[in-house]
Amino acid sequence: GRIDWLESNNEYWLERDAALRTDFHITSGFQTEDMPRIKYKSKMKEYYQKAGIATARYHMVDDLAGCKKFVEEVGYPVVVKPDNGVGASDTHKLASDAELEAFLAYKAKEHPDVAYIMEEFVRAEVNSYDAIIDGSGNPIFEAGNVSPMSIMDIVNNDDNSIYYIIKDLPEDTRA
């Protein structure tokens, strides 16, 4: 019979999954045209803002002058990462003009064609919201994941990951 569902739980495969759904007319998930809004960090921000969810201010990395202008607005440190990337790979926390200049040299040499996003650094506990949703869009099971340590620091410092699950969620986490 016809394939009517395609699913994976790996962020790395999102684009391939969407392409297969589009090619085989599978309507159970994201299609190719949906990919920019869920793969590019800069595009996601627009949808978060429409939903009333605050996001870190950002600047698409261009040149030293443009980046320094952004840093003047938000201050150091800033976080720089690929606009289209998985997890915390190739993520940099920059705390000075010297580190910014070193990053721009690294980008020019190693990844000249990769678009990077620069964001203000926000010190906060990371909370996620996970739910099983019924056919009408109502949550039938909810849970939260709290990560008191920055995932970026865990990856960059080869540290241990710490997180815990909560059942009773703060109301603002459901936004």
Tell me what each language-model feature is.
Residues W13-D17, C67, V126-N127:
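Short, well-ordered alpha-helical microsegments
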Residues E120-R123, N127, A131-A175:
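ATP-dependent carboxylate/phosphate-activation module, predominantly the ATP-grasp catalytic core
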Residues G66, E99:
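Short acidic active-site motifs
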Residues H59-D63, H92-A95:
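Short acidic-hydrophobic, aromatic-tinged amphipathic segments that line or gate anion-handling sites
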Residues Y48, V71-K93, P112-A124, Y129, ...:
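ATP-grasp fold ATP-binding core
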Residues K69-F70, F103-Y106:
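CheY-like receiver
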Residues R2-I3, Y76, S161-I162:
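Local beta-strand N-terminus motif with an aromatic residue
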Residues R2-Y40, G52-D62:
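A short, GP-enriched loop/loop-strand-helix hinge that lies immediately N-terminal to
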